[in-house]
Amino acid sequence: MIKVKFAVIGNPISHSLSPLMHHANFQSLNLENTYEAINVPVNQFQDIKKIISEKSIDGFNVTIPHKERIIPYLDDINEQAKSVGAVNTVLVKDGKWIGYNTDGIGYVNGLKQIYEGIEDAYILILGAGGASKGIANELYKIVRPTLTVANRTMSRFNNWSLNINKINLSHAESHLDEFDIIINTTPAGMNGNTDSVISLNRLASHTLVSDIVYNPYKTPILIEAEQRGNPIYNGLDMFVHQGAESFKIWTNLEPDIKAMKNIVIQKLKGEL
């Protein structure tokens, strides 16, 4: 059996759970593939082609802070990644690098499994960065009501082509009770960041509050929503499903999503 080599590049990268998750999948499928975390500082990124080539990598994930920086090094980029302006998955095929973005489809695939009737949901997305755009692009394909995206600065919407409602955060705060799902894509609530992105005072009791962060397991917005009695949903499924979609792109095989999710949960529980 040919051993296929995969990786994730970023900086910092030592705390990435991607190698653990992908190896659980390889083991479940009896594959002898490998997956390693490669730390690539910004000042060494110009050598990325050499770094990947020397390690004979067949496909790799791209994480912070390189999701936009990788684009000029690609030979081709699919429409979804081009629209988002960020790449998190690269397929190395016949010496060519092809870029994809699986963050949006990863999040939506997970959300569909826990939210019945998503097609008719009124959805508010907080933040207008790459993650927001990727999720909005995927939701736009399946949700009938017009999506609403809120951001602190309206200039972030200048390169958005989707037909959506674009509002500022204060407007969003005063209309929170109109939404069935609220998705936070801003960095507020990540480890060490206790900023609150928005006031939940007008939150309706049925609204699902979600955050794309999975570490910490519950961000401040999720803790507050849960204390109010609202259902909450973190970014764990997004992390698992984006990895699963990357694996499909690299191998054309179906991943063992359950094995991938279980190992990440076990690891997080050990760290909490």
UniProtKB/Swiss-Prot annotation:
Say if the entry is tagged with keyword Ion transport.
no
- A molecular function (GO) term: NADP binding
Describe its partners and assembly state: Homodimer.
Disulfide bonds listed in the record: none
- Name of encoding gene: aroE
Alphabetical UniProt keywords? Amino-acid biosynthesis, Aromatic amino acid biosynthesis, NADP, Oxidoreductase
Q: What is the catalytic activity of this protein?
A: shikimate + NADP(+) = 3-dehydroshikimate + NADPH + H(+)
Q: Which organism is it from?
A: Staphylococcus epidermidis (strain ATCC 12228 / FDA PCI 1200)
Q: What is this protein called?
A: Shikimate dehydrogenase (NADP(+))
EC top class, in one word? oxidoreductase
Q: Tell me the Pfam families matching this sequence.
A: SDH_C, Shikimate_DH, Shikimate_dh_N
* Stored InterPro entries: Aminoacid_DH-like_N_sf (IPR046346), NAD(P)-bd_dom_sf (IPR036291), SDH_C (IPR041121), Shikimate_DH (IPR011342), Shikimate_DH-bd_N (IPR013708), Shikimate_DH_fam (IPR022893), Shikm_DH/Glu-tRNA_Rdtase (IPR006151)
- Residues reported to bind shikimate: S16, L17, S18, T63, N88, D103, Y214
Write down the Gene3D superfamilies for this protein, in alphabetical order.
Answer: Leucine Dehydrogenase, chain A, domain 1, NAD(P)-binding Rossmann-like Domain
Q: What does this protein do?
A: Involved in the biosynthesis of the chorismate, which leads to the biosynthesis of aromatic amino acids. Catalyzes the reversible NADPH linked reduction of 3-dehydroshikimate (DHSA) to yield shikimate (SA).
| Pathway in which the depicted protein is active | Metabolic intermediate biosynthesis; chorismate biosynthesis; chorismate from D-erythrose 4-phosphate and phosphoenolpyruvate: step 4/7
What is the active site of this protein? K67
Give the protein family. Answer: Belongs to the shikimate dehydrogenase family.
Instruction: Tell me which domain of life the UniProt entry assigns to the organism this sequence originates from.
Output: Bacteria
Q: Which GO terms describe its biological process?
A: amino acid biosynthetic process; aromatic amino acid family biosynthetic process; chorismate biosynthetic process; shikimate metabolic process
* UniProt EC number: 1.1.1.25
Which residues are recorded as binding NADP(+)? E79, G127, A128, G129, G130, A131, N151, R152, T153, M154, S155, R156, I212, G235
**Single GO cellular component annotation?**
cytosol
